[in-house]
């Protein structure tokens, strides 16, 4: 299954989760597309709940199914910590996600585009791979030729707050992942235990 590139608002309503971080997708209609009102949502089976939670997490980070599953397999090989949280930490360390967390993009999808287009540097070197795994302390910055890209400047100006696990210099347009986040600092609406249950049955 490839990465979803369709209407994000419709997908957000289907999942019951804001994919942009603004919540605007659910402000008017917080029920599934094609459903006549919020009270007609059918009850999901155990498998359905697990699948829905997996999809929520996958679409939140905008990762294709194959890459998402491979990342889960990598998480199973980490000996310390809790599997579900370790999986989420691997997602958090993706370069496109860190660019989003720093406020250099308004959405993860936009952050992925900035990385793909070569606007982003890691420790002074251009990296155009959204899945690049960021290590705490690495400096994420905007390439000199891209410092005046309107979309980047608008994103920085629109960002009202940043997570405690990142630092950012708005004048230099650079920042870093200062530490790995705690569980209560990321995606409280996700029940990663259901995602683990889903893949434990599949692998």
UniProtKB/Swiss-Prot annotation:
<comment type="similarity">
    <text>Belongs to the universal ribosomal protein uS4 family.</text>
</comment>
<dbReference type="InterPro" id="IPR022801">
    <property type="entry name" value="Ribosomal_uS4"/>
</dbReference>
<protein>
    <recommendedName>
        <fullName>Small ribosomal subunit protein uS4</fullName>
    </recommendedName>
</protein>
<dbReference type="Pfam" id="PF01479">
    <property type="entry name" value="S4"/>
</dbReference>
<dbReference type="GO" id="GO:0015935">
    <property type="term" value="C:small ribosomal subunit"/>
</dbReference>
<keyword id="KW-0699">rRNA-binding</keyword>
<dbReference type="GO" id="GO:0019843">
    <property type="term" value="F:rRNA binding"/>
</dbReference>
<dbReference type="GO" id="GO:0042274">
    <property type="term" value="P:ribosomal small subunit biogenesis"/>
</dbReference>
<feature type="domain" description="S4 RNA-binding">
    <location>
        <begin position="93"/>
        <end position="156"/>
    </location>
</feature>
<dbReference type="InterPro" id="IPR018079">
    <property type="entry name" value="Ribosomal_uS4_CS"/>
</dbReference>
<comment type="function">
    <text>With S5 and S12 plays an important role in translational accuracy.</text>
</comment>
<comment type="subunit">
    <text>Part of the 30S ribosomal subunit. Contacts protein S5. The interaction surface between S4 and S5 is involved in control of translational fidelity.</text>
</comment>
<dbReference type="InterPro" id="IPR005709">
    <property type="entry name" value="Ribosomal_uS4_bac-type"/>
</dbReference>
<dbReference type="InterPro" id="IPR002942">
    <property type="entry name" value="S4_RNA-bd"/>
</dbReference>
<dbReference type="Pfam" id="PF00163">
    <property type="entry name" value="Ribosomal_S4"/>
</dbReference>
<keyword id="KW-0689">Ribosomal protein</keyword>
<keyword id="KW-0694">RNA-binding</keyword>
<keyword id="KW-0687">Ribonucleoprotein</keyword>
<dbReference type="InterPro" id="IPR036986">
    <property type="entry name" value="S4_RNA-bd_sf"/>
</dbReference>
<dbReference type="GO" id="GO:0006412">
    <property type="term" value="P:translation"/>
</dbReference>
<comment type="function">
    <text>One of the primary rRNA binding proteins, it binds directly to 16S rRNA where it nucleates assembly of the body of the 30S subunit.</text>
</comment>
<dbReference type="InterPro" id="IPR001912">
    <property type="entry name" value="Ribosomal_uS4_N"/>
</dbReference>
<dbReference type="GO" id="GO:0003735">
    <property type="term" value="F:structural constituent of ribosome"/>
</dbReference>
